[in-house]
C-alpha cells in the first residue's frame, strides 16, 4: 500500500441511527475494509455505528463513498488525523448492544443536549455558572483535560450513570452543564442521560476534544496536557500529533507504543513497572 508523505489517514466517526440489520452489515463492511487494506475497529449496534479506521487517503475516501450507498449513513462526518506509523494491527467489526456502552436498556439517545462549537467553547465554559464535566475514564483524564473540568473518577463509561445520579442530588435542574469527551460520542450520549434526569441546560463540545484541538491548533486554549486515543499512538498533543512524552504513572519513565497492552486496562505503565506490579 502506498501512502503520501503524511502517512496513514485516521478517520473517527459515529452516528446514532436505527440499524435494524446491523448483523447483516458486519460481513459486508469487513470484506470492504480488508479488500482495501483498511484497519481499525467498527462497532455496530441497533442504535448506530461508532468507528475509528486507518488507511491510505484513497482507501478512506472509498470507504466513505461506500457508506454513502446506505441512506442511513450518507454524508457521514468524521474527524481526520494522521500518523507516520500504522495505528492498528488488524481490522475488526464488532456487534454490540450499544455503540458506546452506558449500560441502560431502552435509553433514548435523541434527548441529547445542544452543541457548542470549538471556537465558542472556551468562552462558554469560562462562565462560573457552567459546570464542565469530563465524561472519559480516569486514566484518560490523567493525561489531560480542560482547565477546571470535573473528573467523575470513573474507570469505565458504564459507571457514569451512577456518578451522575449522585452528583445531581443537590443540583437545581436549571443548572448549566457542559460535557466533553474524546470524539463526541460519549458526551453526546451522556448529555442525553443528564436530560433524562431533568436537567434542561445541557451542552456538549461538537466533535469532542479531537475536533477542538484541530480547530484551535496553535491558539491559546483551556486545554491542558495530552489527549488519550484508543490506538497505537496512545495520545496526541495539542497539535493532534502523536505524543512523544507519555509518562508511566509509576516511575514517570517514557511509555511508548510497545507498552500499549498495559494502557488498554487503564494502567499507563512502562513494561518494567508492569512486571513489578
From Swiss-Prot:
**HAMAP family reported in the protein's UniProt record:** TrhO (MF_00469)
Determine if tRNA processing is one of this entry's keywords: yes
Q: Where do the Rhodanese domain residues begin and end?
A: 126-221
Its EC number(s): 1.14.-.-
**Record's function text:** Catalyzes oxygen-dependent 5-hydroxyuridine (ho5U) modification at position 34 in tRNAs.
* Active site (UniProt): 181
Q: Which domain of life is it from?
A: Bacteria
Q: Which reaction does it catalyse?
A: uridine(34) in tRNA + AH2 + O2 = 5-hydroxyuridine(34) in tRNA + A + H2O
Record-given protein name: tRNA uridine(34) hydroxylase
Q: Which cysteines are joined by disulfide bonds?
A: none
What is the main EC category here? oxidoreductase
- tRNA processing as UniProt keyword: yes
- Family of the protein in this entry: Belongs to the TrhO family.
Gene Ontology MF terms in the entry: oxidoreductase activity, acting on paired donors, with incorporation or reduction of molecular oxygen
Q: In this record, what's one Pfam family?
A: Rhodanese
Q: Which GO terms describe its biological process?
A: tRNA modification
The species is: Anaplasma marginale (strain St. Maries)
Q: Keyword annotations for this protein?
A: Oxidoreductase, tRNA processing
